[in-house]
Amino acid sequence: MDIKRTVLWVIFSFSLLMLWDNYNRYTGKDSIFFGNAGKQEQTAAKAEGKGEQPVSDVPTVSGPVPANQAIPGGQAPAKSEIITVTTDLVKADIDTVGGEIRRLELLQHKESEHSDKNIVLFDSVAPRTYLGQTGLTGGEYPNHRSLFKVAPGTREMGDGNQVQLVMEAEQQGVKLVKTYTFTRNDYRIDIKHDIVNNTNAPITPSVYMQLVRDGGKLAESMFYSTFTGPAVYTNAEKFQKVTFDSIEKGKDEHIKKANDGWIAMVQHYFVSAFVPKSDQPRDYFTKKLATDMYAVGTVVPVGSIAPGETKSLDATLFSGPQESSRLDDVATGFDLVKDYGWLTIIARPIFWAMQHIHAVLGNWGWTIIALTVLIKLIFFPLSAASYRSMAKMKLVTPKMTEIRTKYKGEPQKMNAAMMELYKKEKINPLGGCMPILIQIPVFISLYWVLLASVEMRNAPWLWIADLAAPDTLFGSYTIFGFHLTIGILPILMAISMFIQTKLNPTPPDPVQAKLMMWMPIIFSIMFFFFPAGLVLYWVVNNVLSISQQWAITRKIGAPTT
């Protein structure tokens, strides 16, 4: 039996199955392997207190607020006014109703390489709803539906390092003062909540922080999908994703109580998160607010506040790109929002190496090429062993064909004769496939690094404007309802795969031989949908592999065509 070819066919078949599974999820169907995909992204709540939804009276009405709509709790109608704060990185619109962040524009990130529009995370313009809200709960206290007064002050950072916005609201003798602090070159917004008890009795309010978002996902390729939805992190349970679908079905399983942690709303390349600064007990919740409207939040008790006393609770709101250089400074475990898949332990060192290479070369395209060469050098001995085995197999292919013909219909005798041939020619039938199998985790990890890294987004290289998008050199077309971009890299990929096929031993089975000839075309079509950075890696890797394999094959004396 040709074990190597069997293993390669298993890998190829599994790859096609995974692509079909991705297509099912892309079209809204259940996963072949996991059924409801959301179930695999949840952690069962087994610890004490994790199975109960926190009891709170956080206002559930969210989304765009008409100017004349009555405020819950018997307040008079509020007149909404938008206060805009501009820094070097963001432009934030904050509503005087609730002190709610209604719009957050990222000034350093465009929607696409061909667009002059900036990425907008928080937004309240239909059909998008994505908001950051905080307030008090536990009584008739100011919340994200209350009208706030704004203190005078500058709204432009200019040449300074910080800009502050101070807002206050009072209800039933309880005053809430919110202070937003924006800092230069930072996507973190510090939010200080000062609670003043102007009543004649003690109060025990809690501060809630929640992110509200519609359930819409960003446009993606059918060949790869990334997580969009809420997440909860605690030191005990680590990073827990919660899908919109699980919230819809009431099956949102995550930790409900902890003394630390944070909540986030994650999407491809970007994230928003509330991080309470104090380590004290808090509740975590996810819930459906309305049709296609969901929230993830935390409720942090402030403790008893005596009459005339003031207590404070500080928090940080991060809303920006998942740039690795910034994530570690936000909170413990915050780097986990950058999804490297199930081989994170390998992916992180790969990206670390890429960052250092990029610091020298200054371009992500050349960085990918340099990294490919580096990985190829690391695996050079394994690859050489694989190619030597394949070259020897190619030399004995005529003898193997004779054995198959001689013992046709007698598999036991045929296998015995094959093993005798391997022994005589000193060929290890697994010698060609084992080095390939060892390298597969590295290839998968690099795939996720290139897919998840916002650093590659809108990064140019030669004719390519965006390494995170497909190569569009020859234009874009719609074929059978699919948006297809035609570029030179997938074509080069097909050519390199065709050359590799010619260097490998020809399968004795005519059907297998024809399928092997079609594989370059099949894979090149797939790679038309893949990010240019990923295709660039495969093209360079194939060129290096062809050079190494050709040299070894020629040295051993096997035919090279």
Predicted regions and their residues:
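Juxtamembrane "helix exit" motif at the C-terminal ends of alpha-helical transmembrane segments
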Residues: 144, 358, 441-460, 466, ...
